[in-house]
């Protein structure tokens, strides 16, 4: 994206404050945070100017990235791969009575997630990765995806350590007898997350996952296998959703 296009996007999304922050970032470097007003006028969120946070903000709040049809009022939402928490914030404004567990492994992303969680108290930030084993994982610096995401490795020599949880760990640790919405955006780790889904999928009402087949072949197959028996499913680009209920019982 050219500098002019970037400035136009910052102005369109964030107004004059966005332009000023973007100009400051261009002169001084770094990624200054901006408290950006939400398009729905239901609060504000922190985003890092001159990063992919801006594109994610547009995707979530302007582009309708998570505007999937829902026939019930969710009480518990689990956001795996929450990044800085923009999808969690969208859910918080849309379902203010819901409890939202937001998990993010990358330290700088998690720091902004924690800031946003303070603005929306129903969001509970968790600094961890999610996979098929309870263990320690490592953020691999050799496979960067900007600020959008990271690649998790089991090799100690590859980067910063982070605790690794399974979905069953989350269910037990946070006392979640039911998960109404599970959102997964894990840069290819969907395969591992969904590997033992039979142990917990009965607890999930609706699951939506960004399937990064280009990073990890087999993600679509893993999702299809894990959601056998769901009553309906749909897809928007990389986002695949499956819902086991058509109407609230």
Place the predicted regions along the sequence by residue.
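Phosphate/nucleotide-binding beta-alpha loop and adjacent structural elements of enzyme active sites
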Residues: 1-249
């Amino acid at each position: 994206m050219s500098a002019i296009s970037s400035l136009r996007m910052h102005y369109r999304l964030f107004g004059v404050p966005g332009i000023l922050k973007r100009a400051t970032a261009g002169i001084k470097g770094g990624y200054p945070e901006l408290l950006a007003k939400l398009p729905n006028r239901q609060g504000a969120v922190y985003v890092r100017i001159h990063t992919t946070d801006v594109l994610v903000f547009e995707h979530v709040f302007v582009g309708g990235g998570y505007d999937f049809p829902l026939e019930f009022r969710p009480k518990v939402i689990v956001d795996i791969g929450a990044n800085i928490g923009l999808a969690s914030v969208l859910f918080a404004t849309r379902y203010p009575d819901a409890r939202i567990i937001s998990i993010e492994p990358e330290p700088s992303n998690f720091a902004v997630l924690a800031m946003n969680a303070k603005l929306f108290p129903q969001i509970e930030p968790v600094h961890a990765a999610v996979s098929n084993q309870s263990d320690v994982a490592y953020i691999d610096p050799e496979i960067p995806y900007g600020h959008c995401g990271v690649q998790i490795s089991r090799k100690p020599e590859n980067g910063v350590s982070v605790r690794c949880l399974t979905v069953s760990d989350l269910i037990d640790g946070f006392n979640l007898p039911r998960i109404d919405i599970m959102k997964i955006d894990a840069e290819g780790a969907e395969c591992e997350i969904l590997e033992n889904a039979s142990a917990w999928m009965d607890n999930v009402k609706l699951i939506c996952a960004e399937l990064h087949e280009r990073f990890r072949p087999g993600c679509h197959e893993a999702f299809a296998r894990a959601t056998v028996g769901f009553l309906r499913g749909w897809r928007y680009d990389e986002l695949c959703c499956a819902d086991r209920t058509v109407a609230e019982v």
